[in-house]
């Protein structure tokens, strides 16, 4: 702002000027002359304009006015608050006074009004979908594509069929496409709660066996078909009938009820276990035994609801000449890629190029109110950590599956508490609970219930000649190379992996502390048994296995696994060469075959652990092989059981100790053995059943103590640690309350638009 100040200077007569002027006139008498007369104004006028008579001095004078201008500059900062609102004149709530679009523009009719018309039949499905898209889609614009989430990860889904999916990559997609009656959510304090989804409530009979559910009456599949109670019954009984041939995920429901569906056509809607009424949208299920975990089990993806009519229409049943069923895919081929109309959740699968990318777009018929913040989700499969790091750093992706060692690029530990990154504070991230974020990122410490482990296969196989190692349906044959009956007869009636001593020795050959501390950079907390810290009955376990190669070798020696085989002769399944006793020099191998140690490409931590175990076993005479496998080959090895030791992980299906013990060490007979180890220990099974079914805390605790004491003498896996680490995202991504179970649900996410280098709005 400018303030001018003006000052006038007084006029004065100039003698020199007057004399000069008067000499030029006809007047006589100038200063210094002898004659002086009195002047008049007429004399001054005769001289020229602007001359006036100065009678006191008897002179004609002109006044020169000089103006001096002094300029002073004062700067003020004026903060002008722009009016926020809807600036799009095409929107229902256009605000002509708004100067900055806040993303609140409303288009078309409301979600509820459109669905009411669709329910009444006044508009068809195509009109409803059109209007819903106009009404609900994200319209924000910015340089960061605020209506889209892009993620890079290392593992592709195996299937989008909830009835045969038991890997996290598949579950991450299934939870976007299909919905369940209940689901886990965060409570804002780091705890998990169960919230209703397709169900509005349930009641339980006095004996604890019969659950009666009431369902929402406003839910439609993505093709416009309405969901009824019968769809839930069909979905659950399909899981039981199909039997999860690849994943065995069906155990989660098998443990609770039987559909009594011997004819396999589901026309009896679950037999004696189920009743349902589509008119009232209610159904009941009767369990084998009371279960404190039942609601938790159906919150997992195996409890997802599919479109019963479309499944039946796409079900492939083959019969022989006599009409006997020879195969039944229970519509798996149709559900495998998540087709339109299959599910009721917020997204549909637009495209899936296996081992490359999956693209999801909105299911505009989705029942939950509110507009979409994310119109498109893309998941790309990238196994190279450096590529993911670069893409995340450059802002090409919102989530990049960042390796632990790369987190220092985005996070630091504020050691002096001044809220500023100081020199050296990003050298290491040891104090993970106190992690801080560098500009542009959000780093968060999370304590999870995810377990890192390595499973043992007690019944390993080899692929038959000519079979494809990337085809999960390839034929394979058991490797029988040991006399487990110990009856003195020289026969091979089992595999060496069936012997508890070998599995115990392998457990002592693993360097637990090095991997927890160095491989995982202190992101793995010790876990000594199946139950993770933070769960009920975790204190029934204690440390047994440590890194002790001398003990491992002693166990093998005492069990009769002496150095006797020519190492170069060993294969995965063929007959080995036995070195004559007199010719042995102590370099021979102890087992009749090579153990296949399995890890997947892109997971550098599993690869490092597998490498250490192979090296350690080699020093005590156990031959191994195990380069990292591409995901299709990894899954094929898993499904065909053509592996001996497999590094993997476990994220919970439901929050109960049984969800660790049963899938880890329960046999197939009690609905366990999720890892396909072939493990069966009657004492363990009996105690796990008690722990699962008992309603008495003391009885459950004792059952898990008994199971642990038996299991450590006969282990079927190495339990390495519980993951507690740091996650990172860009600061434009707004996430819902964090929960340590289940997938991210993209309908609940938001992404702030970036305009002219600045984020518009906030996540709060």
Where are these regions (language model features)?
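Append "and occasionally in soluble cytosolic enzymes with long acidic Gly/Pro-rich linkers
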Residues: 359-362, 466-484, 491-615, 619, ...
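Detector for C-terminal structural segments
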Residues: 353, 418, 452, 507-544, ...
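Gly/Pro-rich hinge or "lid" segments in bacterial periplasmic/extracellular proteins
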Residues: 185-189, 290-293, 298-378, 384-387, ...
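Secretory targeting signatures
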Residues: 1-44, 66-78, 114, 506
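Ligand-site clamp/hinge motif
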Residues: 364-419, 424-429, 444, 448, ...
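Aromatic- and charge-enriched surface segment that lines or borders ligand/interaction sites
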Residues: 200-248, 282-286, 388-393, 496-498
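Surface-exposed binding/hinge segments that line
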Residues: 214, 248-324
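N-terminal lobe/hinge region of extracytoplasmic solute-binding protein
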Residues: 152-206, 340-344
């Amino acid at each position: 702002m400018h303030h001018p100040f003006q000052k006038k200077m007084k006029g004065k007569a100039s003698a020199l000027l007057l004399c000069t002027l008067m000499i030029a006139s006809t007047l006589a008498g100038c200063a210094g002359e002898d004659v002086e007369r009195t002047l008049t104004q007429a004399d001054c006028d005769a001289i020229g304009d602007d001359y006036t008579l100065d009678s006191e001095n008897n002179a004609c004078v002109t006044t020169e006015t000089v103006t001096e201008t002094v300029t002073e500059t004062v700067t003020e900062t004026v903060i002008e608050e722009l009016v926020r609102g809807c600036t799009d004149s095409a929107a229902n709530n256009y605000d002509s006074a708004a100067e900055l679009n806040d993303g609140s523009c409303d288009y078309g009719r409301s979600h509820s009004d459109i669905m009411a018309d669709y329910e009444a039949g006044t508009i068809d499905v195509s009109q409803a979908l059109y209007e819903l898209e106009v009404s609900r889609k994200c319209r924000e614009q910015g340089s960061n594509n605020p209506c889209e989430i892009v993620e890079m990860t290392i593992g592709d889904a195996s299937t989008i069929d909830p009835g045969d999916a038991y890997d996290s990559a598949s579950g991450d997609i299934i939870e976007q496409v299909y919905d369940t009656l209940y689901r886990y959510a965060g409570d804002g304090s780091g705890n998990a709660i169960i919230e209703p989804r397709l169900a509005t409530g349930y009641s339980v009979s006095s004996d604890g066996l019969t659950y009666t559910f009431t369902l929402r009456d406003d839910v439609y599949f993505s093709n416009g078909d309405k969901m009824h109670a019968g769809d839930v019954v069909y979905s659950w009984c399909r899981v039981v009938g199909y039997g999860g041939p690849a994943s065995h995920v069906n155990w989660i429901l098998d443990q609770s009820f039987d559909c009594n569906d011997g004819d396999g056509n589901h026309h009896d809607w679950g037999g004696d276990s189920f009743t349902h009424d589509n008119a009232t949208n209610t159904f009941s299920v009767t369990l084998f035994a009371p279960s404190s975990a039942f609601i938790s089990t159906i919150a997992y993806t195996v409890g997802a609801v599919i479109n019963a009519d479309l499944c039946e229409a796409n079900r492939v049943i083959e019969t022989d000449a006599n009409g006997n069923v020879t195969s039944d895919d229970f519509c798996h081929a149709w559900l495998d890629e998540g087709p339109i109309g299959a599910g009721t959740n917020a997204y549909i699968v637009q495209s899936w190029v296996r081992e490359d990318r999956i693209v999801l777009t909105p299911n505009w018929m989705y029942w939950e109110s509110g507009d979409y913040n994310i119109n498109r989700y893309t998941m790309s499969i990238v196994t190279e950590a450096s590529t993911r790091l670069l893409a995340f750093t450059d802002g090409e992706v919102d989530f990049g599956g960042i390796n632990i060692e790369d987190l220092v690029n985005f996070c630091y530990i504020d050691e002096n508490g001044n809220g500023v990154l100081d020199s050296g504070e990003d050298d290491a991230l040891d104090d993970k609970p106190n992690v801080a974020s560098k500009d542009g990122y959000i780093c968060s410490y999370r304590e999870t219930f995810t377990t890192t482990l390595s499973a043992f296969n007690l019944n390993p196989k080899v692929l038959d000649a000519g079979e494809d190692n990337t085809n999960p349906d390839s034929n394979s044959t058991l490797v029988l190379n040991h006399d487990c009956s110990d009856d003195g007869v020289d026969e091979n009636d089992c595999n060496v992996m069936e012997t508890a001593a070998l599995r115990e020795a392998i457990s002592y050959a693993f360097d637990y502390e090095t991997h927890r501390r160095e491989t995982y950079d202190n992101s793995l907390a010790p876990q000594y048994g199946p139950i993770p810290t933070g769960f009920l009955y975790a204190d029934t376990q204690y440390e047994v296995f440590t890194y002790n190669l001398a003990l491992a070798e002693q166990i093998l020696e005492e069990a009769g696994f002496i150095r006797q085989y020519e190492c170069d002769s060993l294969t995965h399944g063929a007959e080995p060469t036995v070195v004559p006793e007199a010719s042995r020099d102590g370099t021979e191998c102890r087992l009749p075959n090579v153990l296949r140690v399995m890890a997947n490409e892109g997971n550098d931590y599993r690869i490092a652990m597998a490498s250490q175990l192979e090296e350690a076993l080699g020093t005590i005479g156990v031959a191994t092989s195990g380069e990292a496998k591409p995901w299709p080959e990894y899954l094929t090895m898993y499904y065909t059981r053509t592996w001996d030791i497999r590094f993997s992980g476990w994220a919970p299906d439901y929050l109960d100790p049984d969800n660790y013990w049963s899938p880890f060490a329960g046999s197939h007979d009690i609905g366990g053995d999720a890892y396909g180890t072939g493990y069966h220990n009657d004492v363990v099974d009996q105690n796990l059943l008690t722990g699962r079914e008992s309603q008495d805390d003391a009885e459950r605790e004792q059952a898990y103590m008994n199971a642990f004491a038996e299991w450590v003498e006969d282990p079927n896996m190495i339990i390495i640690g519980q993951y507690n680490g740091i996650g990172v995202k860009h600061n434009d991504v707004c996430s819902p309350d964090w929960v340590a179970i289940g997938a991210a649900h993209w309908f609940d996410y938001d992404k702030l638009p970036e305009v002219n280098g600045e984020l518009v709005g906030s996540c709060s």
